[in-house]
């Protein structure tokens, strides 16, 4: 499974970023091969609007099967869900720890957006 995880640094020990659309970057980790790649999210960090939708589309284009973030807004949630991408919530853990938790089935899957649009 390809997992996209929000992060605040280009480091697997980085905490999962609580923001989705305005996260500083993402790791795409393959849970089967163990490979990972960092993708900066520079174009959306300071976006006036549409950061969640643009970030969601980038993650869909990268072929992710799941997303792990602290929070997810309504428009991004709708787009990711429509594309079949599962969304999981993780707070207070490192990216590498979140990967292990999702593999173990211990991360909660979100059933709806948990913040309003334009949450910063």
Model regions and ranges:
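Non-catalytic interface/targeting segments
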Residues: 1-50, 54, 61-62, 81-83, ...
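Alpha-helical segments flanking ligand/cofactor-binding loops in enzyme cores
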Residues: 57, 77-78
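Conserved residues at the C-terminal ends of beta-strands
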Residues: 70
């Amino acid at each position: 499974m390809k997992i996209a995880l929000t992060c605040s640094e280009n480091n697997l020990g980085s905490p999962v970023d609580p923001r989705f659309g305005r996260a500083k970057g993402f790791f795409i980790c393959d849970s089967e091969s163990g490979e990972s790649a960092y993708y900066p999210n520079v174009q959306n960090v300071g976006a006036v609007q549409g950061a969640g939708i643009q970030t969601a589309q980038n993650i869909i284009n990268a072929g992710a099967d799941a997303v792990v973030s602290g929070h997810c807004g309504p428009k991004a949630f709708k787009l990711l869900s429509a594309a079949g991408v599962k969304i999981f919530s993780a707070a207070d853990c490192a990216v590498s720890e979140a990967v292990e938790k999702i593999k173990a089935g211990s991360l909660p899957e979100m059933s709806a957006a948990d913040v309003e649009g334009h949450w910063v």
